[in-house]
Design a protein with these regions (language model features):
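Glycine- and Gly-Pro-enriched alpha-helical subdomains that act as flexible
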Residues: 49-92, 103
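Active-site His/Glu-centered metal-binding helix of metallohydrolases
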Residues: 42, 46, 50
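Acidic-glycine-rich active-site phosphate/pyrophosphate-binding loop
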Residues: 10-26, 116-125
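A short glycine/serine-rich beta->alpha loop
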Residues: 27-37, 65-70, 135-139
């Protein structure tokens, strides 16, 4: 059994039409995050944790923001491709946990849908929770959103 940890942070977009996705779920009425893909911090942190656990580097190594062919890609696609890399390395995920760090928007009502969506793709329970930074730092000033993820993987 191996453990992996991932962290991701994105600032809010200047584009008022940008959609916010967290944990593969669209958060209606909220300003989206800036990024090369859909900027889903929870899913990106999960991907980084999976890649780290399998000793496969990080998300940027496999899906660089300089690759125009993946501009605007959905994080579901990144997660599916990440799981394939992990599987090809001989592992499968047995557990995952994500903490979303944000002052706004409030996400409690979206947590069950996020867990369901991520769990369906990964094939095991992915739990989620949210916290704030009590107004401290860039996230505390509501300049963006962050996420931290931890996973357990085992040999297939």
């Amino acid at each position: 059994m191996r453990i992996g940890q991932g962290i991701d942070v994105h600032r809010f977009s200047d584009d008022p039409a940008r959609v916010l996705f967290i944990g593969l779920v669209e958060i209606p009425g909220a300003l989206g995050l800036a990024g090369h893909s859909d900027a889903d911090v929870a899913t990106h942190a999960l991907c980084d944790a999976l890649l780290g656990a399998a000793n496969l580097g990080d998300l940027g190594r496999h899906f660089p923001d300089t690759d125009a062919s993946i501009a605007g890609v959905s994080s579901k696609s990144l997660l599916e491709q990440t799981l394939k890399l992990v599987s090809d390395a001989g592992y499968r995920c047995t557990s995952g946990d994500i903490t979303i760090i944000a002052e706004a928007p409030k996400l409690a009502s979206f947590m069950p849908a996020m867990s369901e969506a991520l769990s369906a793709v990964v094939g095991t329970v992915i739990s989620l929770k949210a916290t704030t930074t009590e107004g401290l730092g860039a996230i505390g000033r509501a300049e963006g959103i962050g996420a931290s993820a931890v996973v357990l993987i085992e040999e297939k």
